[in-house]
Amino acid sequence: MAQLLVIVKILPKGTEVDLDEMMEGLKGGLKGGIVLRRYAKEPLAFGLHFVKAEFILEDKEGQNDALEATVRSAKGVSEYEVLNMSRMSVDMK
């Protein structure tokens, strides 16, 4: 089965949220073959940062909805937005 690479933008509830702690909690809640590939903190405005994260998931029904539900239910998460989604090729690094 093919795999998808989903790049998302995750906004915290405020500047007091520890983004690394938020992502560790989110990573622990992932299931069903969804994997956090990597993430980076990016500045947004006025001291607020967001997380740009890459997830790998199977190309089957319900996976994207499961990812969104997991991210939105993680402690400290305010908003979730899909920036890009593409099918992974064999030589993708």
UniProtKB/Swiss-Prot annotation:
Record family assignment: Belongs to the EF-1-beta/EF-1-delta family.
Protein biosynthesis among keywords: yes
Organism classification: Archaea, Nitrososphaerota, Candidatus Cenarchaeales, Candidatus Cenarchaeaceae, Candidatus Cenarchaeum
SMART domains the UniProt entry points to: EF1_GNE
InterPro entries: eEF-1beta-like_sf, EF1B_bsu/dsu_GNE, Transl_elong_EF1B/ribsomal_bS6, Transl_elong_EF1B_B_arc
Protein biosynthesis found in the keyword field: yes
SUPFAM superfamilies hit by this protein: eEF-1beta-like
One MF term in the entry's GO annotations: translation elongation factor activity
The protein, known as: Elongation factor 1-beta
Keyword terms of this UniProt record: Elongation factor, Protein biosynthesis
Free-text function comment from the UniProt entry: Promotes the exchange of GDP for GTP in EF-1-alpha/GDP, thus allowing the regeneration of EF-1-alpha/GTP that could then be used to form the ternary complex EF-1-alpha/GTP/AAtRNA.
Any coiled-coil regions, as ranges: none
Gene behind this protein: ef1b
Pfam families given in the database record: EF1_GNE
Matches recorded under Gene3D superfamilies: 3.30.70.60
